[in-house]
Amino acid sequence: MAKNTKEAALEYHSQGKPGKIEVVPTKPYSTQRDLSLAYSPGVAEPCLEIEKDSEAAYDYTAKGNLVAVISNGTAVLGLGDIGALAGKPVMEGKGLLFKIFAGIDVFDIEINEKDPEKFIQIVKGIADRKSVGRERV
């Protein structure tokens, strides 16, 4: 007998590793040298290049293929105001769709702020205004 939608949905979301998205390394990390290039001291070099030219961030970081899905949980897919944490499965689901259909990596960010102006200020503080709505070809 088929499970009802609630049981099937809860099983889907709880099976295996929790969540629907993860961060996976794109560079080698198996040796001491790899780790020192990935972090300290090697990471300083791309930082200094980006400091000189912000466009270099697209060459040395995931910036060109990474978006944030940001929500405060006040208007979640017909569920209404369920709060930031309760909306997280929806934000992860959006991240999954971005990844499988467009190859775009996502960080979901849930913000506990219901005041619209404060929420906007928080998001503005996170965003790099030079890259908002911008495509790099």
Which residues fall in each region the model found?
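N-terminal ligand-binding/catalytic initiation module
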Residues: 1-134
